[in-house]
Amino acid sequence: MILGWTQRIFTLLVVVTLLAACADEVVNPPKELADIEEKFSVQSSWVEVIGQGDEEKFNSLSPALWQDKIITADVDGLITAFDIKSGKVIWETNLKQPLSGGVTANAGLVAVGTKNAQVHVLDVNDGKQLWHVNVTTEVLAKPAISDGRLVVRTPDGRIFAYSLATQKQEWFYDRIIPNLTLRGTSAAVATSGVVITGFANGKMAAFNLRTGDMLWEQSISAPRGSSEISRIVDVDSTPVVYSNYLYAAGFNGFAIAMDLTNGRYLWREDASVTEELLVDARRVYLVDTKGRIVALDRITGEEVWTQEGLLYRKPTGAADNQDYVVVGDFEGYLHWLDKSTGEFVARIHLDRYGIGGTPIVTDEHVIATTRYGYIHVLENPLATSSEE
């Protein structure tokens, strides 16, 4: 009993010491937005409440697209399908479970993970619940649906693969993770019979989608500091496959390009990234943990430009909008940047709650969700100008 109370007092002292140390740290103020010369204006199409948001928790509940539908989720379990043009609700399903992972829509199905360690699969056309599976812990990343399989990545280092036909588990992978990690998980990407994902130990690995056999493994982050916090090396951003190459980035690590077939490096550059990457034919666009937006040459990894206008404004990952990239920030702004120069060319303020997750761009629309549970669908300014 005495030992128990001693341990509690010691733990309390450690917590107080850590809090005091945090209080002494310099907090970097978010950079004030500078005036810009806008090349085009951006107009709203419709706005709807999509359920209960919860600041940082809502950030992971990004929507999914399926044909003419936007499928959204809220933290209390409400799944909603909207018509992308009108904003009309097509169907609603309440799972009555707290959701913690983003929505995936593919092969006529919707999949979403819960805080209660389940993944639910619904019919994309009417929202009917078809089946669910139990995993080992809450699901923070979007599930993947590919080649007749559902692939789930959990923050305890595990990967589960299920048959869509039988709903049975086909294979399972377990990886030991560090004691201290970021709250987040790299989503699994399933393509061309391969599953790729990052882990909290700074490694990226590829697996055979059918058998679960590991094809290769590569480090993209390595512990560098002396303290446990400074040695966090999570790979939380989702890898991107482009033209037989894999692009990824880690926290306190590197941005990398590697051969998808064998994991060999094409290039590797210092970076600290937790947001999603954007890759096009010429460049890789990343947002680092300080809020810098950086464009790298896709083939060489050389820096093309860096934009520091959103320092410490918690910018989202970048979305592709023809000759521009789109990012959101913590005050609810969407920003358009020129892909060639990194200069700001347009801006719109949606609301004061902050943008949750990387925007989504289609031919006709730009879609953004806010951290308190709103969805904003804008007219794509490039589509409008092309029609005129």
Swiss-Prot record:
Keyword S-adenosyl-L-methionine carried by entry: no
Protein known as: Outer membrane protein assembly factor BamB
Gene responsible for this protein: bamB
Subcellular location: Cell outer membrane
Lipidation, S-diacylglycerol cysteine type: 22
Signal peptide range: 1-21
Main location: membrane
Family: Belongs to the BamB family.
Organism: Kangiella koreensis (strain DSM 16069 / JCM 12317 / KCTC 12182 / SW-125)
